[in-house]
Amino acid sequence: MYSAKPYDRRSFDAANVEGRHGEPIEIQYHEARLNRSTVGYAAGVDVVCAFVNDDLSADVLELLAASGTTCVALRCAGFNNVDLDAAARLGITVVRVPAYSPNAVAEHTLALMLTLNRKIHRAHNRVRDRNFSLDGLVGFDMAGKTAAVIGTGQIGAIVARLLWHLRCDVVAFDPVVKQGLVDLGVTYVELDDALAAADIVTLNCPLNEHTHHLIDEASIATMKPGAMLVNTGRGALIDTAAVLEALKSVHIGSLALDVYEEEGDLFFEDRSDEILDDDNFARLLTYPN
């Protein structure tokens, strides 16, 4: 297992006990990420367990196949870091998590919206500094606002239902229309129409060649001035440079990111004692909205 954290060890060790799923299997844990320099750790193993920031390009897969690996098990839903054509050519089976807890991600998405709207993060910091002023902490009623859900898969569908229960007017964009959402009152529209109508935009779609930089300068121009944007999908759904300019001009009124386009060198590590050399990320951290 590459990119192994203490919580990974605890979860896998708890599940890897005799009698639960047959005989226990031998698991080798490595904190290092999988790449050409670390692929040797997997010499002779049948299965490699990888995470979102591990390198599963053709070069790495060829080295894995040469050393006897026949399966790559992703402990994530996304697979854009895997060269699937190379895996098929090499006879390596690739499996993934079909979905994280859809409810957990959907609830987190809603929590980010409420945090932005009600300025909960700012209020928390003020109270710790014994500043009990309410100035600048006023939000808006989400009831009656238009929310655009971009992607209505397992997670997006739950987000749409949660927003409907908050009495938002929910519009959605997805190539596949879910009749259950339509019956609830969700209206499916084209992407530009969804962005133009929405006070709140949430991205819950996969990353592929069609959705890369889905939110860019052109699509931002179609959005309502002051709209809220939340991304709990994939980092590269957003053109970070374009979003930064929109934040600066307040065309995007507020932004919540659970993912980031260049997160591979940042996330899942303690960077508190380091200088961030990613200028876009550093700029994002300076904005109050």
Question: Which residues does each predicted region cover?
Answer:
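Short glycine-/small-residue-rich Rossmann-like dinucleotide-binding loops
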Residues: 52-53, 199, 205-207, 233-234, ...
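Rossmann-like dinucleotide/phosphate-binding beta-alpha-beta segment
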Residues: 135-225
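Conserved beta-strand positions in the Rossmann-like core of class I SAM-dependent methyltransferases
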Residues: 28, 171, 236
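A short helix->loop->beta-strand "cap" motif at the edges of active sites that frequently abuts
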Residues: 66-71, 90-92, 167-168, 225-227, ...
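Rossmann-like dinucleotide-binding domain for NAD(H)/NADP(H)
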Residues: 226, 233-289
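Phosphate-binding beta-alpha-beta segment of Rossmann-like dinucleotide-binding domains, i.e.
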Residues: 90-92, 98-146, 158-161, 165
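Short beta->alpha connector loops at strand-helix junctions that form conserved
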Residues: 51, 75-76, 92-103, 192, ...
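An N-terminal-biased, well-structured beta-alpha scaffold segment characteristic
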Residues: 1-94, 216
